[in-house]
Amino acid sequence: MTKKISPKSPGKQRKRIYKSPIHSHKKMLKCRLDEFLQEEYGLRSLVVKKGDLVRVMRGQFRDTEGKVVRVDYSTIRVYLESATTTKADGKEAQIPVHPSNIMLVKLELDDDRKRIIDNKVVKTAESE
């Protein structure tokens, strides 16, 4: 079976992301871990989850840390407590941030996530 060749043109790359099924967007919601977390867990990246503490690395809210309030799978965006703006009527509105522009600082660990981390570490150890 041959591997599907991805197009080189940026427009076709973006189209492929937008047209992909929503269940495959979870892979696109990965972001890198802080250096201390990388050493602790032996992983470079993990999928962002509600409740995680993240640091914004690029954009308008650069160098701000905040808790993840919501993860939007359809638009591949993350909403943070600290990334807000004031609307014309005075209400606070959250600004969406792309996962490639944030870094995980503290993880929201539950049993399911611990299992995922353990499975990934075992797989990387076996491949080496």
Segments (PLM) and residue ranges:
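Residue-level "contact hotspot" at macromolecular interaction interfaces
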Residues: 44-47, 59, 96
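Short, solvent-exposed secondary-structure boundary/capping segments
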Residues: 75-82, 92
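Intrinsically disordered, low-complexity, charged/polar segments
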Residues: 1-11, 15, 86-128
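Short, conserved beta-turn/loop elements at beta-strand boundaries and strand-helix junctions
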Residues: 71-77, 107-109
